[in-house]
Regions:
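Primarily recognizes the serine-hydrolase "nucleophile elbow" in alpha/beta-hydrolase
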Residues: 130-132, 136-210, 224
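The conserved beta1-alpha1 loop
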Residues: 60-66, 170, 219, 277
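Conserved alpha/beta-hydrolase "acid-adjacent" motif
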Residues: 225-230, 284-285
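Alpha/beta-hydrolase active-site loop
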Residues: 110-133, 154
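Cap/lid segment of the alpha/beta-hydrolase catalytic domain
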Residues: 93-117, 180
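Short beta-strand/loop motif that positions the catalytic acidic residue
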Residues: 217-219, 223
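Short substrate-entry loop that stabilizes the transition state in hydrolases
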Residues: 52-100, 176
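A domain-start/cap signature at the N-terminus of enzymes
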Residues: 1-58, 70-76, 84, 137, ...
Length: 382
């Protein structure tokens, strides 16, 4: 744990972020309703390209804090790539009633357990999309940025039987935090579970005994919001279940950036990690040139490499020279079939007690107000 002055500084910095930085008016996504009990109270957006092939793949895309589904899609280019290559995209969206800063609640115990909270809501959306549109259950993938990357880690840990692969961009390892102070400390690289505990947390998150998803990890070397040691923790967690050594099988340069690859006993690439030199907090893009995809903006960083294209290729979703002539437009949906597992009760979220009529004056009262104001602005307190 850091001292109180460090905590106040971090909270105050989050309070200064523009509320609408990640919002977008360019929205061609469709709405998904009636997908289940939705215990996490999330919104579901989706996109189907024209002439979608039978048994198409599904990519689940999770936005970061201060963003919404349309804004993250506009920046990352996932539906643009889906139109080009022929797969479906599901974009869960956080609501302000759950989190004032629109962060997925990646460390709240009631939201990150199998069959409860936000994790179950996303699972229900996936089931509804697969059943309604005849998608391929063997080709379901999940990716996300920051809090969305941490939530992607949650989904991969709690439902490894659902996903063929995942990609975590500037995210955090599953189970690395369960409280607000722990979340801030992990983001800054302070403390956290040991390598063996990270691997144990992953194994205990589900009853899964089969093959594990392939994992792609992306991190900016100059990220001070979610520091690079978090990528190391994610890698350590997944190296365990895949039976991999800490040292990579090979290292190489891709579009001028460092890539490490870990292969399984059959020689298949099962874990990869990109370190983007000099990049801060955000999703790496190539917004110009022959392979341009996405648009630069807040937390969407044009650094000359498209994480979206490379992730899709790692999953086997794309072929470099195959492009469909399609335009990203709204897709019309049909009635959705609810998914109803044995749902675990979600802990009631308790609002903070009202402030006293005469709050304490002096330094202590001032510190309390700064902390509470910043927590609310950061989406960590209601």
């Amino acid at each position: 744990m850091r001292d109180i002055s460090d905590t106040i500084a971090r909270l105050s910095a989050m309070r200064g972020r523009p509320a609408g930085a990640g919002q977008s008016k360019d929205d061609h996504l469709s709405e998904m309703t009636g997908f289940g009990s939705n215990p996490g109270a999330l919104r579901a957006r989706f996109y189907l390209p024209e002439n979608l092939p039978k048994q198409a793949a599904l990519v689940v895309v999770l936005h970061g804090c201060t963003q919404n589904a349309a804004a993250y899609d506009h920046g990352s280019g996932w539906t643009e790539l889906a139109a080009e290559q022929g797969f479906a995209v599901l974009l869960p969206e956080q609501q302000r009633a759950n989190n004032a800063n629109l962060c997925f609640n990646w460390f709240v115990p009631g939201d990150v357990s199998r069959d409860s909270g936000e994790a179950l809501s996303i699972r229900q959306m996936i089931e509804a999309a697969v059943v309604t549109h005849g998608l391929d259950r063997k080709r379901i993938f999940v990716t996300g940025l920051s809090a969305g990357g941490a939530m992607a880690a949650v989904m991969l840990a709690t439902y490894p039987d659902v996903f063929a692969g995942g990609a975590i961009i500037a995210g955090l390892a599953y189970g690395s935090a369960s409280t607000i102070p722990e979340a801030f400390d992990r983001m800054r690289g302070h403390g956290g579970p040991s390598r063996s505990d990270l691997q144990r947390l992953l194994r205990e998150a589900s009853p899964h005994k089969g093959a594990w998803p392939r994992i792609s990890v992306w991190q900016g070397s100059a990220d001070t919001t979610v520091v690079p040691s978090n990528a190391d923790a994610v890698l350590a967690q997944w190296q365990g279940v895949h039976g991999l050594a800490q040292a990579p099988t090979r290292t190489e340069k891709v579009d001028g950036q460092g890539r490490k690859v870990w292969c399984d006993g059959k020689g298949r690439d099962v874990v990869e990690a990109y370190s983007i030199a000099g990049m801060g907090h955000g999703t790496p893009l190539q917004a110009s040139g022959d392979n341009a995809l996405g648009k630069a903006g807040p937390f969407m960083l044009d650094v000359g490499i498209s994480s979206t294209r490379h992730i899709a290729r790692f999953w086997g979703l794309t072929k470099p020279d195959v492009r469909r002539a399609a335009k990203a437009e709204a897709a019309s949906g049909t009635a959705l079939q609810p998914f109803s597992p044995k749902e675990k009760p979600r802990a009631v979220r308790v609002d903070p007690a009202p402030e006293p009529v005469n709050p304490p004056s002096g330094p202590a009262g001032g510190i309390t107000k700064v902390i509470e104001d910043a927590l609310r602005a950061a989406g960590l307190m209601r």
